[in-house]
Amino acid sequence: MRRKGTKPSTACHQEEGPPPSQDGAHSDEEMEQPAGEAESAAPAKPPGEELDNRSLEEILNSIPPPPPPAMASEAGAPRLMITHIVNQNFKSYAGEKVLGPFHKRFSCIIGPNGSGKSNVIDSMLFVFGYRAQKIRSKKLSVLIHNSDEHKDIQSCTVEVHFQKIIDKEGDDYEVLPNSNFYVSRTAYRDSTSVYHISGKKKTFKDVGNLLRSHGIDLDHNRFLILQGEVEQIAMMKPKGQTEHDEGMLEYLEDIIGCGRLNEPIKVLCRRVEILNEHRGEKLNRVKMVEKEKDALEGEKNIAIEFLTLENEMFKKKNHICQYYIYDLQNRIAEITTQKEKIHEDTKEITEKSNVLSNEMKAKNSAVKDVEKKLNKVTKFIEQNKEKFTQLDLEDVQVREKLKHATSKAKKLEKQLQKDKEKVEELKSVPAKSKTVINETTTRNNSLEKEREKEEKKLKEVMDSLKQETQGLQKEKEIQEKELMGFNKSVNEARSKMEVAQSELDIYLSRHNTAVSQLSKAKEALITASETLKERKAAIKDINTKLPQTQQELKEKEKELQKLTQEEINLKSLVHDLFQKVEEAKSSLAMNRSRGKVLDAIIQEKKSGRIPGIYGRLGDLGAIDEKYDIAISSCCHALDYIVVDSIDTAQECVNFLKKHNIGIATFIGLDKMTVWAKKMSKIQTPENTPRLFDLVKVKNEEIRQAFYFALRDTLVANNLDQATRVAYQRDRRWRVVTLQGQIIEQSGTMSGGGSKVMRGRMGSSVIDEISVEEVNKMESQLERHSKQAMQIQEQKVQHEEAVVKLRHSERDMRNTLEKFAASIQGLSEQEEYLCVQIKELEANVLTTAPDRKQQKLLEENVSVFKKEYDAVAEKAGKVEAEIKRLHNTIIDINNRKLKAQQNKLDTINKQLDECASAITKAQVAIKTADRNLKKAQDSVCRTEKEIKDTEKEINDLKTELKNIEDKAEEVINNTKTAETSLPEIQKEHRNLLQELKVIQENEHALQKDALSIKLKLEQIDGHISEHNSKIKYWQKEISKIKLHPVEDNPVETVAVLSQEELEAIKNPESITNEIALLEAQCREMKPNLGAIAEYKKKEDLYLQRVAELDKITSERDNFRQAYEDLRKQRLNEFMAGFYVITNKLKENYQMLTLGGDAELELVDSLDPFSEGIMFSVRPPKKSWKKIFNLSGGEKTLSSLALVFALHHYKPTPLYFMDEIDAALDFKNVSIVAFYIYEQTKNAQFIIISLRNNMFEISDRLIGIYKTYNSTKSVAVNPKQIASKGLC
């Protein structure tokens, strides 16, 4: 059953609307209105209701370029194809059904009526965004499958799968990598729908953009022909009847792409109409102002006549006043002649006197300024030196004090440490001594017991040897008993002697300390005295050597200054010579490379055989490197040779011919004078520089030759600027760019490219120079360079000597100042030590021991020592005897008795040490308290002295830092001032010398000037009288002001020449003429305001004319742009139209086997006025309009047009629903064969019930319906036929 459809050209079927909601869904009512219908619903605005105020450039720039073809028509180009369609619960398809796969070229869908064939097309329309009504449904929810077996389904989905392929032979093809994608649309029960691209949620706009980018024509729906619509394509009206209606003209315009120009053409047309209206208004204003201006012209002329008369009268007054002044000046001249005779001989003296006076004033002022400056700097240096000397003295004093205080602090620290250790030691003496006594007593008792044991052991040993040593042993025992008595006496005597000695040492300790301090003080006094003596001698030596060093330093500095100046002069000379040598070498190199013709001509010039030769034109001038390429590209005459005249040029030509050297072109300067007037500056577009003005020459005569070569060629930065500048309305210019591109006055363009010309003209003018001259310059450069090196070496030696002398001088000064400052400190130290020695000597006397007490203690020590010595001597004798006996016994007993005896000796020795330790401990306990009190007093005194000394050290360090900072500042200031002092002193001496010379000259001139003064005073009185009269007449002339007349510039009061003044013989006649003119002026009564009013109207008239010209120019620009766009639209349309109509004719002839069809213009002069008519001549019939054809003929005509449009603008996909319904068997076969054979770069999916259509297809998609659900099956007819299955 066929469906009623609408023609695809009247509306677009895709969705457009507001953005989707958050869930991405669209409602059927809100979102599925076609864009074309939305446009038709909006009322058209009248052209004058809203004016487009964009500039012409903005309007033209807003025009998009012609749309590119969506896909290529040539073989092997990538194209889009549908692989298969997946329907899920869509219309008659229950569940998920896959339709396909479709063939890459020709697929037919077949099946019985009502099986769901057209639902295949509907599924694609659904995905492509068509409204529900276009898919034969009232709303989207109706598209969801509903049958007895499948109820309450909530949604339906259709997926169309695409891929891009490259065709190969036969049915084979290559799939482009990553080109597969699918577009799906899902509709819900609430009539909303969502789109997905390859599973990702998208808007319909994204889907539309994607499909358009792959060549699917969603805008004109050429890919889709539904039931009954095939003939409606050809039946469109020639042109749309309304603005939003679409006929054949609009249909073709959209396909060709020139429709994009319609809106800009309308805008420009409206702007031209409005500008014409405005221009009419401006023209009327000009005429009105011109009429008012003409009405004021009579009064204006009368006023001008009056002003002219007054000007004539003022001129006459000017003449008579000048005559009177001239007469007085002649009288003054006579007197002046007398005056000149008087002081003619003294004129030079007066001038010299004035000059000397001015010089004297200037020099006196300069001397005062320099003296002030010099005094200020000198005073500043002296003040700083005094400050530094004082600071250095303070520094030495503080350092000496700091040194003494630091030394004192170190000694006190050591003393304090010793005193503290002594206090701690004395504090622990009683306890330690008691502990020692207890421990020693215990140890002594233990040793006594041990000795008894060892003696018993020894006795046992000796008993064993008794028989052998019995006699000796008895004798030894007797001696030992005697020794035991002696040992007790010895220990007691030794203890008494050591106690007495300790008491004597403690009693004499303070006195011994005082004696030690006195000895050290005397040694320090000797050291200070020797240092003072050495420094006084050093000061005397420095005072002798310092002046000699200073004198030597001055001489070296003078020599260094002289060498420095010589070095500067020589370096400057060497630098200049180096530049000259480099320029000479460059010039020589360029001269060598200029060619044999130019070399021969230049050689003739140098030899003098052909005078008047200047040289190659390019070598006679220079230009900035920026313009090198420009002038090298556009000026062919740079290689011409410049000569003074045509005769010289002829001589050069004859010379070249005679010697067969070559040919050359010459410029004769005597023929170039015709260009002199045109060489002046000119006004150029955009102030573009003229190349001629950029050329620099040494000889101004050559400029005419350069103008001849360049004329008014301009140089632009780039080709865009060059194009703007070259094509001016009133004149065309010759322009060259910095890249060498040239635009001639004729409009032709040349130059540019990858290789450009450069180097034909240098950045400096080249002089002729020989190899000998270059060698001479190089020799001179080498000589001066060696001399500069020698002076530099001498300078370095002098600089080193000056540095050494300055160091030596500075060291002497510092040493002198330090020694001078330290002498006082050493003297004070010497005095201090003397006082200290006296104090220490008094202290020695104070601490001197009592002689009686000392003698008593010494006598005690002596008595105890004698007692000890006497007892010890006796004990020693007994002990020696015991030892002898013991040794004898030992010798007898050999080694048996020796070990035991050694043990016993060791114990005896330890017992002696214990006795001595107990004695010392007892003495220490007795003297500990007294010594502790003295030691604690000493610690307190030392700590107080340390605090005072530390405070003194910190104060001295702070003072020393302040002194150093001040000294550094003073030194820096002094150095800065001393650096500027020599220059100021030199300037002062020079000024004084110059001033002395001027004073001597001035005194000589004053004597001569005095005698002349008296004579001149008499003459000056007469001249003054005449001058006062001249001033009066000059004042009268200054009052004379001429009136400006019309637009002429105001005339200045003429100054008569001497000849004109002498020609005035009768001044009274001029006076009479002035009186006559005054009478005429009094009779006239003009309106002088008429001139200003006329001028005002004239300015307004010119302003109105300028406005008229401006709007006329703007109107012309818009009108020209309007005409250009109309022409462009026509050209684009006709180019596409001829391609389409020719292909239409070819297709129709093929489809009908002899018929003819064409698209013809209703109005051959203007295709856009009446539109396009589709005319057809079926085979063996006459030409007919499309409306008069049969159904089959209309179908064939429409298909021919569809295929012609495909040829012009290919579309990858075509869907056709029973396009062969109205065709007979023969025509169906022709159409099917045409689709199969001719259209190989597109995919056709056709629904057909005609066997001669679907039998020829590459793939059949069978549609059948069972159990209220549509199914499909795909087969390849050719494969089935090849297997013999049909």
Swiss-Prot record:
Residues 1-51 are annotated as: Disordered. One of its GO terms (cellular component) is nuclear speck. The modification Phosphoserine is found at residues 21, 27, 40, 141, 980. It comes from the Eukaryota. Pfam families: SMC_hinge, SMC_N. One of its GO terms (molecular function) is chromatin binding. Residues 611-725 form the SMC hinge domain. GO terms for biological process: cell division; kinetochore organization; meiotic chromosome condensation; meiotic chromosome segregation; mitotic chromosome condensation; positive regulation of chromosome condensation; positive regulation of chromosome segregation; positive regulation of chromosome separation. The modification N6-acetyllysine is found at residues 379, 677. It is found in: Nucleus; Cytoplasm; Chromosome. Keywords: Acetylation, ATP-binding, Cell cycle, Cell division, Chromosome, Coiled coil, Cytoplasm, DNA condensation, Mitosis, Nucleotide-binding, Nucleus, Phosphoprotein. ATP binds at residues 111-118. Residues 270-589, 768-1018, 1068-1133 form a coiled coil. Its main location: nucleus. Central component of the condensin complex, a complex required for conversion of interphase chromatin into mitotic-like condense chromosomes. The condensin complex probably introduces positive supercoils into relaxed DNA in the presence of type I topoisomerases and converts nicked DNA into positive knotted forms in the presence of type II topoisomerases. The SMC hinge domain, which separates the large intramolecular coiled coil regions, allows the heterodimerization with SMC2, forming a V-shaped heterodimer. Forms a heterodimer with SMC2. Component of the condensin complex, which contains the SMC2 and SMC4 heterodimer, and three non SMC subunits that probably regulate the complex: BRRN1/CAPH, CNAP1/CAPD2 and CAPG. Belongs to the SMC family. SMC4 subfamily. This is Structural maintenance of chromosomes protein 4. The gene is Smc4.
